[in-house]
Design a protein with these regions (language model features):
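Catalytic-core helical/loop segments in enzymes performing group transfer/polymerization on anionic/lipid-linked
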Residues: 1-586
Length: 586
């Protein structure tokens, strides 16, 4: 346990969202005058900030999921996912097979990571405080969103706490919270976009007729547009370039460019990848067998006395079967026809998840050269637990069905040397990240915005995982991320002629303004959310991070890196240890 002082609590309260904190305050406002009676565990900085405005201090959840807990949970995750891989398989008429199981595991693993973390925190907290009464907020009705992730209306902490309290014979009180299950504005907007996209797709299919050898990319995310532009300028005029997936606005601009002087560097050749398609009778029969095996497996899942199989069973029947299995079938059907029609000579992608996983598998089945250009960092793992997480993550980014994989950094090369690889490595140097920074005159003005030329600038950049994309051990939770910032601000405030820039992207609704309210008052730091990261990296003297692609961005540009991990939980790369013990500075 990270928190070592042990005190008995009369009331132990678990809160995850602001609406839960609000209804809790309304119910217990008078009793909260005796603050010592209540210990509140916050699962999100927004809750902590909201309570602070009412003069109430909450304890962050991550304190009750220490290193040993993360390691244990990764072993449980590995056991569960391997049960699926060993016992469940599904193949369609195009030959696509691995994508069904891997796409499902990708979604299930994220869901399980959140649930297991919450179970671990609630269990450890109850054992630590030995409360007389546990309080949590239960949403009504229980709602399963049509989403392959866990949505904000899908809340399970009250059920978790209730099961644990029942087993330990502790009084449990739940507060009912009415939650609107449908956002009609979003539904209408989504429906209109789908309709307009269909019209746009049909128009493009008619007017597009690439006459040259075609190179396609799955998306332009993570800098893939730069890769396409580089290719266009470096290879002969015998090739044309196109993207399968573009956001609606970008797709519209791309098409308009065909009729104006603003001709885009790459074309837009969409695929009807999300259009529903009924499976053939053989596939439907195989899918039913697959689903029965899967449900039998997950119904047996229980962790620390909490039944999680029933939740996942419901999630699968209501959502994952249609949104993962059926959509993977649709991707396979439509992408197979797409590849047959356009006959690309090369397929590129920055990741291999969902439709891009099917694209990679089909490319290999059809003997179309394909290359994975990983959008994220991969480094050699130095312990068996972080290795479990990295190897699983690699299946969608660097160890994929694509025939080739671009090796962009020496650390990626070292990582690949230690795994059984599906792809052929090609040393390309930096493509999506780690490129040499061009120091422009504008950067001088950016630096002077924060500090004088004689001052030292420290840049903090991290990649915490939001609630719907939970990951264990190798990434910070969002409350742990903010806690680290607090410590950095306190440390830098004691230094002369040093300024800390917190490079922050809004996550899970936590705005820069709310974040500032959680940080100490100091003139020694600034929060930067706008502009290109490369510009900020070019003005920094030292990068500070937990685990992020920004680490390799800095190292590739000869900028020193400080791995900052207060609780010594994870070491992203080997370095010189500056401070040992609990500080976790490397």
């Amino acid at each position: 346990m990270i928190i070592r002082d042990k005190k008995k609590a009369d009331y132990l309260v678990f809160l995850e969202f602001i609406d839960e904190a609000d209804i809790f305050l309304k119910k217990y406002l008078n009793e909260l005058e005796s603050a010592d009676k209540f210990t509140i565990i916050s699962f999100h900085p927004l809750v902590k900030s909201y309570l602070l405005k009412h003069g109430i201090v909450a304890v962050d959840s991550f304190h009750f999921c220490p290193t040993a807990s993360h390691q244990k949970l990764l072993c449980v995750l590995e056991e569960y996912t391997e049960q699926i891989r060993r016992n469940c398989c599904l193949k369609d008429s195009t030959g696509v097979e691995d994508s069904y199981v891997e796409n499902l595991i990708y979604s299930i693993r994220s869901i399980l990571s959140l649930w297991l973390y919450q179970i671990e925190v609630v269990s450890n907290t109850i054992e630590h405080y030995l409360p007389e009464t546990v309080v949590s907020v239960r949403p009504e009705p229980i709602y399963i969103e049509q989403n392959i992730w866990i949505g904000n209306n899908e809340r399970f902490i009250a059920d978790i706490a209730g099961q644990i309290c029942n087993a330990k014979k502790i009084v449990f009180k739940s507060i009912a919270l009415q939650i609107g299950s449908r956002n009609f504005r979003k539904m209408i907007s989504r429906g209109l976009k789908k309709k307009l996209s269909g019209i746009l797709y049909s128009t493009i299919q008619v007017i597009s007729n690439p006459e040259k050898k075609l190179i396609i990319a799955s998306v332009i995310d993570f800098g893939m547009d730069k890769v396409l532009n580089d290719l266009k300028h470096k290879i002969s005029g015998d090739y044309s370039f196109a993207v399968i997936g573009l956001p609606f606005k970008a797709a519209f601009r791309n098409m308009c460019g065909l009729f104006t002087k603003n001709i885009p560097d790459y074309g837009y050749l969409p695929c009807y990848k999300n259009r529903n398609i009924n499976g053939d009778s053989e596939f439907v029969e195989d899918k039913n067998k697959f689903s029965k095996k899967l449900i039998k497996i997950i119904n047996g899942w229980k962790y620390r006395g909490v039944l999680i199989g029933s939740w996942l069973n419901q999630k699968y029947k209501n959502c994952l079967e249609s949104e993962v299995i059926d959509k993977t079938y649709g991707h396979s059907y439509h992408l197979n026809r797409y590849l047959e029609k356009w006959k690309p000579v090369l397929v590129l992608s920055p990741y291999s998840r969902l439709f891009s996983a099917v694209l990679g598998e089909l490319s290999c089945l059809r003997n179309i050269p394909s290359m994975m250009i990983p959008h994220g960092t991969f480094t050699p793992a130095y312990d068996e637990y972080s290795k479990k997480e990295w190897n699983e993550n690699a299946l969608g980014i660097i160890n994929t069905p694509y025939k080739y994989v671009a090796v962009q950094t020496p650390l990626a090369e070292k990582y690949l040397s230690g795994v059984s690889l599906n792809s052929k490595p090609v040393i390309t140097g930096p493509l999506l990240f780690g490129r040499q920074i061009k120091r422009l005159n504008d950067v001088v003005f950016l630096r002077r915005k924060y500090a004088s030329d004689a001052d030292v600038i420290i840049l903090h950049a991290g990649t915490p995982k939001h609630r719907s994309g939970s990951r264990l051990l190798n990434y910070e939770t969002i409350d742990e991320y903010v806690d680290g910032m607090v410590s950095l601000v306190n440390a830098v405030s004691k230094l002369n002629r040093v300024h800390l820039i917190l490079r922050y992207r809004q996550i899970d609704g936590l705005s820069s303004e709310t974040l500032k309210g959680l940080l100490p008052e100091s003139d020694s730091y600034s929060i930067a959310s706008e502009g290109a990261f490369s510009d900020y990296l070019s003005i920094t003297n030292l990068l500070v991070s937990f685990s992020s692609t920004t680490i390799e961005e800095a190292l590739q540009n000869n900028i020193p890196v400080l791995l900052f991990n207060k609780y010594n939980r994870y070491q992203h790369i080997k370095g010189v240890e500056l401070s040992s013990g609990s500080s976790g500075l490397f």
